[in-house]
């Protein structure tokens, strides 16, 4: 397959600097791709702006039909997408096939249906002789910046609602993991009118800044780090652009002494280490009540140490590599900083593995304190800390003592306690006796420095619209 940009309905080679794309399981170069030039970024935005005049006025049915065609096409090419995602990200192939591709297809299908249900409210007569109506209209050109942890899924989360609402999109995947987005461009070319969906490739400083700063971009949607979010907000502030930010998390997992510890251990084994822990909602910050602390540490140690690392194509592999050498170094530095603290116990893991690729052993760090960096900062790797707490008030205070506010979970058999905690936790989502469960019908998004705006659900669709008041005199 030839990897090209999609600009105004045409696949073209990039005209900028060539960048290497790596296989993180081996550390080897997969291929080189040329970035978009500033002129190509401008051409993509101009094409989107021109296409918006017609696409923004199409019927919801017409937009839905395009989204359904794209969903069908992804499903028909599922194995190729899965292989590309696995090769480029190091994900276990069976996880991409069984978990991610079906969810991606479902997102496009959900928003195809949601597009036909979005409407304004008939507000009625609030002034004598005048009738008011509320419209929800598309915004215009949306610049979408997708991350490297779930390249195709995050592209789907951004593209589906934006296009369903009638916007035109220019999307830039991460330069680390662009392959599935560029494959998606090949399919989209024959489904959407020229200019409605444009796909670029390049780094943030060479392509992203030009894209988000373009005068005709009306909205910027980012999934990335807090630092990247801050940069984009500063960069776009002079033009007062609308923004949609999902900027990471440090999910507290609150385990009370009446919890099912086997379920907790299995849950953390799965939900703390899926995708090598490179997930904003990962179950990575455990608070265990004193009465069950030692027992939970033992169970978690056994569970985490049993995770099988290996080649992505191996059916038995549960944990693949980290996405890049630079990220492996960041995770290693965070764990080494924690290990240097005298009170930290390394129950299992704690270092990168020998051999090829960017692998880091699944790690459990016990006896962490609330003020430790390993508790306060997002590591974004296969690393889980566990901290002891005494009572409900203390753990609520500690759980909320974070700059992040994306996801959390509470493990207890006490229904009243579950409701009390979920009402007071400062997180966009709180799961009870589970973690990491996402469905297209429900919103995903954070508060505090985890960002704002919702992905998925009707709330996600509304985020890509403008509320307008129409008043008719009669």
Swiss-Prot record:
From the UniProt record, which GO molecular function terms apply?
Answer: aminobutyraldehyde dehydrogenase (NAD+) activity; NAD binding
Q: Which Gene3D superfamilies match?
A: Aldehyde Dehydrogenase, Chain A, domain 1 (3.40.605.10), Aldehyde Dehydrogenase, Chain A, domain 2 (3.40.309.10)
**Enzyme Commission number(s) from the entry:** 1.2.1.19, 1.2.1.-
Q: What family is this?
A: Belongs to the aldehyde dehydrogenase family. Gamma-aminobutyraldehyde dehydrogenase subfamily.
Name the pathway it acts in: Amine and polyamine degradation; putrescine degradation; 4-aminobutanoate from 4-aminobutanal: step 1/1; Amino-acid degradation
Report whether RNA-binding shows up as a keyword of the record.
Answer: no
Keywords, comma-separated and alphabetical: NAD, Oxidoreductase
What does the protein in this record do?
Catalyzes the oxidation 4-aminobutanal (gamma-aminobutyraldehyde) to 4-aminobutanoate (gamma-aminobutyrate or GABA). This is the second step in one of two pathways for putrescine degradation, where putrescine is converted into 4-aminobutanoate via 4-aminobutanal. Also functions as a 5-aminopentanal dehydrogenase in a a L-lysine degradation pathway to succinate that proceeds via cadaverine, glutarate and L-2-hydroxyglutarate.
Recorded hits in PROSITE patterns, A to Z, give: ALDEHYDE_DEHYDR_GLU
Positions contributing to NAD(+) binding = 146-148, 172-175, 209, 225-228, 280
Query: What's the catalysed reaction?
Result: 4-aminobutanal + NAD(+) + H2O = 4-aminobutanoate + NADH + 2 H(+); 5-aminopentanal + NAD(+) + H2O = 5-aminopentanoate + NADH + 2 H(+)
Cross-referenced Pfam families: Aldedh
What more the UniProt record tells us is: 4-aminobutanal can spontaneously cyclize to 1-pyrroline, and 5-aminopentanal to 1-piperideine.
Class of the enzyme per the UniProt entry, highest EC level: oxidoreductase
- State what protein this is by name: Gamma-aminobutyraldehyde dehydrogenase
| Residues annotated as the enzyme's active site | 246, 280 (nucleophile)
Q: Which domain of life is it from?
A: Bacteria
A biological process from GO: putrescine catabolic process
Quaternary structure? Homotetramer.
């Amino acid at each position: 397959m030839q990897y090209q940009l999609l600009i105004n309905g045409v696949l073209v080679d990039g005209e900028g600097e060539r960048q290497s794309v790596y296989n993180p399981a081996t550390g080897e170069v997969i291929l080189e791709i040329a970035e978009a030039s500033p002129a190509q970024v401008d051409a993509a935005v101009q094409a989107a702006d021109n296409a918006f005049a017609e696409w923004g006025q199409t019927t919801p049915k017409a937009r839905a039909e395009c989204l359904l065609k794209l969903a069908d096409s992804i499903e028909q090419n599922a194995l190729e997408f899965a292989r590309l995602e696995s090769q480029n990200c190091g994900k276990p192939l069976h996880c991409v096939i069984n978990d991610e591709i079906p969810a991606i297809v479902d997102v496009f299908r959900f928003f195809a249906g949601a597009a036909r249900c979005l409407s304004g409210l008939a507000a009625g007569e609030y002034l004598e002789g005048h009738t008011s109506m509320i419209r929800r209209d598309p915004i215009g050109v949306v610049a979408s910046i997708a991350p490297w942890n779930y390249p195709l899924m995050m592209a789907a989360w951004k593209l589906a609602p934006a296009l369903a609402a009638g916007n035109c999109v220019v999307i830039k995947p991460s330069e680390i993991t662009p392959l599935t987005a560029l494959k998606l461009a090949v399919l989209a070319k024959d489904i959407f009118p020229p200019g409605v969906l444009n796909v670029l490739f390049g780094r943030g400083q060479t392509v992203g800044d030009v894209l988000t700063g373009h005068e005709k971009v009306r909205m910027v949607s980012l999934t990335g780090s807090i630092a990247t979010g801050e940069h984009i907000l500063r960069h776009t502030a002079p033009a007062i652009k609308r923004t949609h930010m999902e900027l990471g998390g440090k999910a507290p997992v609150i385990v009370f002494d009446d919890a099912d510890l086997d379920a907790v251990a299995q849950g953390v084994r799965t939900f703390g280490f899926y995708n090598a822990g490179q997930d904003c909602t990962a179950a990575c910050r455990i608070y265990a009540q004193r009465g069950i602390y030692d027992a939970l540490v033992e169970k978690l140690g056994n569970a985490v140490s049993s995770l099988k690392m290996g080649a992505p194509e191996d059916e038995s592999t549960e944990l693949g590599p980290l996405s890049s050498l630079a990220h492996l170094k960041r995770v290693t530095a965070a764990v080494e900083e924690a290990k240097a603290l005298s009170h930290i116990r390394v129950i299992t893991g704690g270092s990168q593995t020998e051999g090829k690729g960017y692998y880091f052993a699944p790690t459990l760090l016990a006896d962490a304190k609330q003020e430790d960096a390993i508790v306060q900062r997002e590591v974004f790797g296969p690393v889980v800390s566990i901290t002891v707490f005494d009572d409900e008030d203390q753990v609520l205070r500690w759980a909320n003592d974070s700059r992040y506010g994306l996801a959390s979970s509470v493990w207890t058999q006490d229904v009243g306690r579950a409701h009390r905690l979920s009402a007071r936790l400062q997180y966009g989502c709180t799961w009870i006796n589970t973690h990491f469960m996402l469905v297209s019908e429900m919103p995903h998004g954070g508060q505090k420095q985890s960002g704002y705006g919702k992905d998925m659900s009707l709330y996600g669709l509304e985020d890509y619209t403008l509320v307008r008041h129409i008043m008719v005199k009669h």
